[in-house]
């Protein structure tokens, strides 16, 4: 594989390093010819984000990773964590970014894990995996 490109049936698949998202050293796969990004753990679609491995600086790095994905101008984004009935719209990039911003804002404005958890549920009541949110709230307030 020369560089970060893979040829698959005449399509270039580019491995794009993203840095920290829900863990360190995340990558995504970009298929420019069809406007596709397989975002892996960088983008969530209708699911609470896994934030226990991040502090405010790491969450800023995640937002930078989302900016990088957005700069690829995808028409479809395959999220690594997804509510099955949701489509693969690129709007999930901004939804993931906004979730991180909401979490950071509320982490600063709350005092207990339960308060942070409850406030996030008020903003994001329909997301799956409330256990991930609880783990994130506990980590942010420990």
Describe these PLM feature segments.
Residues 1-25, 33, 66, 70:
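Metallo-beta-lactamase
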Residues 4, 9-12, 71-76, 83-142:
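Accessory terminal helices/loops
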Residues 20, 41-42, 80-83:
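Active-site metal-binding loops of divalent metal-dependent hydrolases
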Residues 29:
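Acidic, metal/cofactor-coordinating or nucleic-acid-engaging core segments within structured domains
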Residues 36-38, 78:
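Residue-level marker for buried hydrophobic side chains located in beta-strands
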Residues 43-50, 84-85:
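A short, flexible beta-alpha/helix-coil linker loop
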Residues 50-53, 104-106:
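Second-shell loop/turn segments in exported
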Residues 53-80:
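An active-site-proximal "capping" alpha-helix that borders the catalytic cofactor pocket
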């Amino acid at each position: 594989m020369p560089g970060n490109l893979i040829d698959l049936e005449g399509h270039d698949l580019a491995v794009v390093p993203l840095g920290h998202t829900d863990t360190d050293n995340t990558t995504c796969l970009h298929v420019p010819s069809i406007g596709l990004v397989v975002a892996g753990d960088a983008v969530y679609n209708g699911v609470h984000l896994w934030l226990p491995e991040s502090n405010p600086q790491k969450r800023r790095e995640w937002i930078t990773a989302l900016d990088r994905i957005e700069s690829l101008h995808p028409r479809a984004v395959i999220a690594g964590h997804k509510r099955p009935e949701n489509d693969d719209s690129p709007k999930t990039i901004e939804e993931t970014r906004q979730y991180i911003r909401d979490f950071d804002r509320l982490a600063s404005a709350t005092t207990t894990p339960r308060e942070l958890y409850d406030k996030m549920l008020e903003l994001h009541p329909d997301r799956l995996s409330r256990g991930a949110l609880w783990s994130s709230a506990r980590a942010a307030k420990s």
